[in-house]
C-alpha cells in the first residue's frame, strides 16, 4: 500500500482497477479528490499491442509496463495492491484482500469500476508482482520465438496484431484463421479489406471462413500444440504452437451485486457511464456495457467519467457529459512498426505517423506527458529500465 493519506475535506473516490482506463481516471481526479486505486498488480500492464508485446517485448514494456511508483500524478493517491472481494452499494464500502492477505474495508463517496476483462493469457486479474509479470512475458515470447509454425485463431484486432507482427519479424510460418470472410469484425469495411491485403503482403497465410472448435472449458489462457478442429468442415490443422484469440471476454465483475450487471456480467451504465440506481457509481472500459462494442476504453470514456465525477462532487448532477461511441472501432491495430504507426478511423480512412515522429512525439510527449502526466525515470529494479 502506498500514496497520500486521505483528507476528510475532499470526496473519497475509489477507482477499482488501474489498467489503461482506470489509471487515467485516477491520475485526473487525484488533484481534487482523495483517490484510492485498487489494482491486482503493482504496475500498469497494458492489454494493448499484443503483437509488439510478443515480438518486441523490450520496446513494448517501455510504454505499456510501468510500475505505479513512476507516475507522478499518483503521488497524491493511495494505491492498494490486491483484489476487491465485495462491494456494499448501500453502505458505500468496498472490501479488499491485499496481496499480503490483509483485509481492509474502504469507504467511498464515489466508486469508479474499471476492472477490465479477461481475454486469453495476456489479460487476467490474478494478483501478482513484477517478477511474475516478467516471467509470463518472457515465457510467451520465448515459446513463439522457438516455434517454426504458428497458428493464430481469431481475426479480431488481437489475432491480426500477433499474426502480422510475427510474420514481419521473420523466421516463422504464420497462419491466421478467422470465421468470417474478412478479419477485424467491428471495423469499417474499408479497413477490413485493407487489412486482408496487408496481412497477405506481409507474408501471413490467411484462412477465412474457419471456425475453430474450442475445447470444453478452455478459455484461451495458454498456447497449445494439439491439432485444431473446425466446425466449418475443414481438415484439422497442426502447428508447432497455436495462439487463441477467439474472444470469450470475461468481465472482472464478480465482486459486484448481480443487480447492476447484464446477462453477460458486464456493468450496466447509462449515457453518462453511471450505474442505474446508483448515481455515485460509474463504470468505464472493457467491464462496462456502454455500447454494443463496449468501446469506452478507446473512445475517451475516461474523460466522461472524470468530468461527471467532478460535476457530481460540485453538486451539478444536471449537467453531466454524455458518452457517445462511433459505429466502428478505430485506432492502431498493428502497433509501432519500422515504417511508423498506422491509425485507422471509424470512417474507414487511415493515416500513418512516421516512426521518427511516433517515438519522440506520440509516445514521448503525448503518452508520457499528456496522458500519464509525467513519469519518473526508470530504475534498475523497473522492467522498463
Language model segments and positions:
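A Rossmann-like FAD-binding core segment of flavoenzymes
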Residues: 74-94, 106, 171-269, 317-320
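FAD-binding core/adjacent interface of flavoenzyme oxidoreductases
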Residues: 2-16, 74-151, 232, 243
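FAD-site-proximal beta/loop scaffold in flavoenzymes
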Residues: 130-148, 236-301
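C-terminal auxiliary extensions adjacent to catalytic cores
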Residues: 2-4, 335-385
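A conserved FAD-binding loop/helix module that cradles the flavin
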Residues: 269, 284-336
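Beta1-alpha1 glycine-rich phosphate/pyrophosphate-binding loop at the start
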Residues: 2-78, 164-190
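Glycine-rich active-site loop/strand segments that organize a redox cofactor
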Residues: 37-59, 114-143, 342, 356
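Catalytic nucleophile loop
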Residues: 19-22, 156-160, 302, 306
Amino acid at each position: 500500500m502506498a500514496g497520500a493519506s486521505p483528507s476528510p475535506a475532499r470526496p473519497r473516490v475509489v477507482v477499482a482497477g488501474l489498467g489503461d482506463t482506470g489509471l487515467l481516471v485516477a491520475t485526473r481526479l487525484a488533484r481534487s479528490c482523495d483517490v484510492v486505486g485498487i489494482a491486482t498488480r503493482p504496475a500498469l500492464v497494458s492489454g494493448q499491442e499484443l503483437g509488439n508485446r510478443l515480438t518486441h517485448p523490450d520496446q513494448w514494456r517501455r510504454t505499456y509496463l510501468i510500475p505505479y511508483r513512476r507516475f507522478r500524478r499518483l503521488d497524491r493517491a493511495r494505491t492498494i495492491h490486491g483484489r476487491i472481494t465485495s462491494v456494499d452499494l448501500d453502505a458505500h464500502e468496498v472490501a479488499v484482500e491485499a496481496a499480503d492477505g490483509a483485509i481492509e474495508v474502504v469507504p467511498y463517496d464515489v466508486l469508479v469500476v474499471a476492472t477490465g476483462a479477461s481475454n486469453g493469457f495476456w489479460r487476467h486479474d490474478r494478483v501478482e508482482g513484477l517478477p511474475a509479470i516478467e516471467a509470463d512475458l518472457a515465457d510467451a515470447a520465448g515459446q513463439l520465438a522457438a516455434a517454426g509454425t504458428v497458428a493464430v485463431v481469431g481475426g479480431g484486432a488481437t489475432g491480426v496484431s500477433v499474426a502480422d507482427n510475427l510474420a514481419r519479424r521473420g523466421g516463422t510460418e504464420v497462419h491466421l484463421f478467422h470465421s468470417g470472410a474478412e478479419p477485424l469484425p467491428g471495423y469499417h469495411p474499408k479497413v477490413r479489406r485493407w487489412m486482408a491485403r496487408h496481412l497477405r503482403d506481409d507474408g501471413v497465410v490467411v484462412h477465412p471462413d474457419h471456425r475453430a472448435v474450442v475445447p470444453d472449458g478452455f478459455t484461451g489462457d495458454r498456447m497449445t500444440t494439439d491439432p485444431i478442429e473446425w466446425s466449418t468442415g475443414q481438415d484439422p490443422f497442426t502447428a508447432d504452437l497455436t495462439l487463441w484469440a477467439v474472444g470469450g471476454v470475461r468481465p472482472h465483475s464478480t465482486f459486484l451485486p448481480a443487480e447492476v450487471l447484464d446477462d453477460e456480467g458486464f456493468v450496466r451504465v447509462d449515457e453518462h457511464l453511471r450505474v442505474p440506481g446508483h448515481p455515485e457509481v460509474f463504470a468505464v472500459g472493457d467491464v462496462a456495457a456502454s455500447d454494443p462494442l463496449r468501446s469506452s476504453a478507446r473512445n475517451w470514456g475516461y474523460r466522461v467519467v472524470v468530468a461527471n465525477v467532478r460535476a457530481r462532487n460540485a453538486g451539478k448532477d444536471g449537467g453531466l457529459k454524455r458518452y457517445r461511441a462511433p459505429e466502428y472501432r478505430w485506432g492502431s491495430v498493428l502497433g509501432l512498426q519500422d515504417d511508423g504507426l498506422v491509425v485507422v478511423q471509424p470512417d474507414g480512412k487511415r493515416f500513418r505517423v512516421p516512426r521518427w515522429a511516433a517515438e519522440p512525439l506520440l509516445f514521448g510527449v503525448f503518452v508520457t506527458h499528456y496522458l500519464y502526466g509525467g513519469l519518473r525515470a526508470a530504475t534498475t529494479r523497473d522492467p522498463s529500465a
